[in-house]
């Protein structure tokens, strides 16, 4: 006779344990009846069949209740419940939750979350519970095991059971044309630029509550250009009244005509009266300046998610050549340069993204070239804006449709082709979910790094890699079943207000909207994969680099195949891996130990990036990474690390951007350099721990974590902190003319 333990182990039945458990219960109520205890023990023994522990305890309870010893039965039940609670209290999940609640286990997996705060602790504790439910009770066994074994990683696993989606480009035209409603009221359409800027922040905040990733505008200049006109008309009307001394009826006629014709703010209809026009423009510029500053301050102070998070916001701009659109872009860049707060510190959000395009802003004779120069000025001081390439070979823009213009959100997400009628339009679309393949895990098993073989087993690698790709496809489809089954009532702001496409078609489920979104197949650790397979990374050897490129190309091909099979939008994605860089590394160390240049550092290298420790020039880094950028159409980014003093040479900075976009076809570029602020006097430059002005060591050291900034790099998780300290400045290895 055997007993199945709670942990699944099978052991021989021990009658003494049954007898002793009954005697303990009897002793606790001073009613010791050894004969009854032996009788019950013998009856259980005579069943002579395999049982689990709970079945045996149920039999003891039932037999005690059937006897005259009801008090003993009650004592046994209490004892059993106490033991159950003790076991649960000592379980890994409960211990994890208790640690979260105490604020002692600070992981900083997301630099935008304050894990020390009450709401941050609550968020992380809830997250631990939801993750365990998803892995142990919801997912298919093979998918759960692949996650636990470290082959794949489900991002934001705590949202799996809820069916939330990741990120979205909001349809601002829709909500600003019709207004929008929230749970406690409704909002009229804005009638001025200042009101529109306030409502952008409100809409971003409300949308962020019904998803777990970033919220963005794919063309803020186009979204807000009409409100520049509305504000100008008001200021011009005031000028007519106070300078022109016109009566109300005359002013009403002038403005009515302007509105009917939707006249531009530079139309000669207005410029004819120089004094009134100058007044109106001056007041408009002042309003734009204050409104943009207000937007930036709001987006850095509206803590609307658990853990004191602000909405993860991104704004794209720079393409609208109308006077109104240009003023929107200028206002945003001026606000970025000005900074926030009493010390004019660099704003963390929004991630501002300048939409680079030849014929629009790339070259000196382009109409918006002055905005590019202003963007470079902002970049040199604030790290933002990033630059996105409208001329990228995979952009597929329609020059007559701004909704198709190249844009990114969050750390790097791009939204590609929609098979369900929207084509390359991005507005009202986003990403449903990313799942990342841990490439070094497969490579360790088939490479030379463990010493089991002298030559990599490439066939074995490809077989396993394709097996994992198929598993990722299955995992996406399983999660989508949960997502599409949700009611629109789960996200009323999004579905009632039409921030997402085809929300009006969603009645009992949200499939009609979510089908337009993408399913990202991500990857991490190309460098460590190559090292594990061949003993070199892709920055060190051309042949190794070609193999690495074939792996990423295969993900892209598989995404296309999965799109065809399922009539959904799969994409290849260069994963940001903020917390995953450390989580995946720890899993590999647990399984394989320390392997030089594979698991020997405290992080894995993001996507296909050249390892941060490699001493390469600016242009070599760009040239190495550029071929990879063709394939992750779901999003990628290229970084360059620079000295802060280098940023004073704006022409050199512009040359880097032009070379990356015009010569190398890189889609998305960001330049990194240190920004330090003395929090006692506000002095800003690279301070190296001490302020030269006031001597304070109360220094904020701002760095980029993945695609976004955070207030101080010491708030990153341990993996990202280690990476920051090992980042090589590529300027040190570059000869500049």
Tell where the protein language model's regions lie, with residue ranges:
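Charged, amphipathic alpha-helical regulatory modules used
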Residues: 1-100, 105, 722-728
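Short, mixed-charge aromatic SLiMs
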Residues: 43-48, 64, 547-561, 723-735
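Short alpha-helix boundary/capping elements
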Residues: 64-71, 228, 534, 710
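Conserved catalytic cores of very large enzyme subunits
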Residues: 86, 93-515, 536-537, 541-703
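Core of folded catalytic or high-affinity ligand/protein-binding domains
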Residues: 503, 515, 519-522, 721
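Contiguous, well-ordered alpha-helical segments that form the cores/surfaces of helical PPI scaffolds
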Residues: 519-532, 553
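Long insertion/accessory domains within large nucleic-acid-processing enzymes
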Residues: 689-737
């Amino acid at each position: 006779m055997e007993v199945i333990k709670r942990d699944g182990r099978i052991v021989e039945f021990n009658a003494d344990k049954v007898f002793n458990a009954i005697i303990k219960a009897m002793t606790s109520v001073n009613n010791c009846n050894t004969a009854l205890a032996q009788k019950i023990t013998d009856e259980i023994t005579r069943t002579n069949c395999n049982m689990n522990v709970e079945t045996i305890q149920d039999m003891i309870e039932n037999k005690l209740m059937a006897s005259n010893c009801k008090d003993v039965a009650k004592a046994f039940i209490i004892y059993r419940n106490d033991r159950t609670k003790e076991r649960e209290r000592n379980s890994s999940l409960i211990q994890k939750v208790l640690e979260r609640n105490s604020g002692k286990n600070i992981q900083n997996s997301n630099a935008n979350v304050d894990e020390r705060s009450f709401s941050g602790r609550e968020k992380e504790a809830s997250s631990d519970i939801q993750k365990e439910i998803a892995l142990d009770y919801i997912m298919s066994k093979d998918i759960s095991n692949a996650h636990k074994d470290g082959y794949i990683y489900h991002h934001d696993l705590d949202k799996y059971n809820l069916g939330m989606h990741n990120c979205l480009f909001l349809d601002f035209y829709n909500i600003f044309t019709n207004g929008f409603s929230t749970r406690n009221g409704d909002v009229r359409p804005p009638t001025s630029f200042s009101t529109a800027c306030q409502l952008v922040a409100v809409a971003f905040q409300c949308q962020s509550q019904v998803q777990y990733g970033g919220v963005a505008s794919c063309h803020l200049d186009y979204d807000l250009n009409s409100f520049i006109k509305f504000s100008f008309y008001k200021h011009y009307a005031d000028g007519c009244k106070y300078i022109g001394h016109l009566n109300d009826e005359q002013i009403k006629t002038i403005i009515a005509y302007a509105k009917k014709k939707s006249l531009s703010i530079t139309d000669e209809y207005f410029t004819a009266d120089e004094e009134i026009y100058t007044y109106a423009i001056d007041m408009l510029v002042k309003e734009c300046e204050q409104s943009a500053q207000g937007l930036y301050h709001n987006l850095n102070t509206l803590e609307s998610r658990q853990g004191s998070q602000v909405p993860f916001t991104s704004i794209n701009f720079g393409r609208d050549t109308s006077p109104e659109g240009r003023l929107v872009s200028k206002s945003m860049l001026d606000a970025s340069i000005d900074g926030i707060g009493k010390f004019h510190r660099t704003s963390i959000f929004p991630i501002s993204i300048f939409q680079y395009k030849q014929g629009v802003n790339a070259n000196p004779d382009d109409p918006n070239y002055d905005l590019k120069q202003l963007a470079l000025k902002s970049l040199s001081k604030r790290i933002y804006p990033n630059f996105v390439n409208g001329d990228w070979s995979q952009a597929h823009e329609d020059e007559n449709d701004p909704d198709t213009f190249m844009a990114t959100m969050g750390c790097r997400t791009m939204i590609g082709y929609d098979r369900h009628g929207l084509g390359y339009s991005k507005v009202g679309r986003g990403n449903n979910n990313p799942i990342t393949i841990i490439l070094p895990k497969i490579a360790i098993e088939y490479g030379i790094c463990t010493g089991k073989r002298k030559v990599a087993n490439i066939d074995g690698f490809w077989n396993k890699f394709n097996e994992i790709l198929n598993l990722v496809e299955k995992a996406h489809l399983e999660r989508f079943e949960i997502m599409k089954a949700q009611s629109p009532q789960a996200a009323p702001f999004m579905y009632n207000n039409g921030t997402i496409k085809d929300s009006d078609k969603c009645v009992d489920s949200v499939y009609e909207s979510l089908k337009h979104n993408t399913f990202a197949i991500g990857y991490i650790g190309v460098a460590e994969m190559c090292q594990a397979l061949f003993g070199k990374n892709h920055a060190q050897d051309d042949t190794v680099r070609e193999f690495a490129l074939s792996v990423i190309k295969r993900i892209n091909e598989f995404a296309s195949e999965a799109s065809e099979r399922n009539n959904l939008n799969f994409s290849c994605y260069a994963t940001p891996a903020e917390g995953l860089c450390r989580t995946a590394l720890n899993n590999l160390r647990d399984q394989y130990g320390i392997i030089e240049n594979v698991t020997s550092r405290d992080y894995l290298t993001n996507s296909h990036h050249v390892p941060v420790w490699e001493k390469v020039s600016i242009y070599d880094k760009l040239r190495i990474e550029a071929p990879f950028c063709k394939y992750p159409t779901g999003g990628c980014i290229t970084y360059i690390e620079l000295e802060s003093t280098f940023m004073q040479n704006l022409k050199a900075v512009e040359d880097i951007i032009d070379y990356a976009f015009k010569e190398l076809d890189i889609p998305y570029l960001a330049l990194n350099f240190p920004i330090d602020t003395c929090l006692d006097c506000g002095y800003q430059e690279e301070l190296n721990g001490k302020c030269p002005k006031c001597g304070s060591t109360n220094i904020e050291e701002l760095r980029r974590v993945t695609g976004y900034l955070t207030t101080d790099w010491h708030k990153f998780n341990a993996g990202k902190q280690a990476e920051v300290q090992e980042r090589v400045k590529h300027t040190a290895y570059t000869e500049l003319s």
